[in-house]
Amino acid sequence: MSYRQMLIHRCDIYHEAAQAPSAGRFGIPADRLQPVISYPDTPDEQDVPCYFTEKTQQLIQEEPDQTVYHSFLVHFPLSADIRVNDKIIWENHKYILKLPKRIRHHHWEVVAVRDESL
């Protein structure tokens, strides 16, 4: 079995876009404020081959409801364009990627995290 055949899942990748705030707030000039982070409506890459392995799952009781914290170790081919803080959508769930690690110039491994209220 080849490595490509192991990548049985497919996900969409959205690269983050940082934009400077349009106006200053609270007496702070706009060029001194943190950039506004957003993601495009259409994916930058579609149907990217990958493989998800569950690492941890926690259900935390918070006000007013529970929050699920879910992390996966995701494998991508070396040709995939993945970056820190990319948003991926897999099986209708949104995950944020942490720091990708290149493994022996062969593939990428990255932790994907989901935290949302139920």
From Swiss-Prot:
<dbReference type="InterPro" id="IPR024556">
    <property type="entry name" value="DUF3599"/>
</dbReference>
<dbReference type="InterPro" id="IPR038667">
    <property type="entry name" value="XkdH-like_sf"/>
</dbReference>
<comment type="similarity">
    <text>To B.subtilis YqbH.</text>
</comment>
<dbReference type="Pfam" id="PF12206">
    <property type="entry name" value="DUF3599"/>
</dbReference>
<protein>
    <recommendedName>
        <fullName>Phage-like element PBSX protein XkdH</fullName>
    </recommendedName>
</protein>
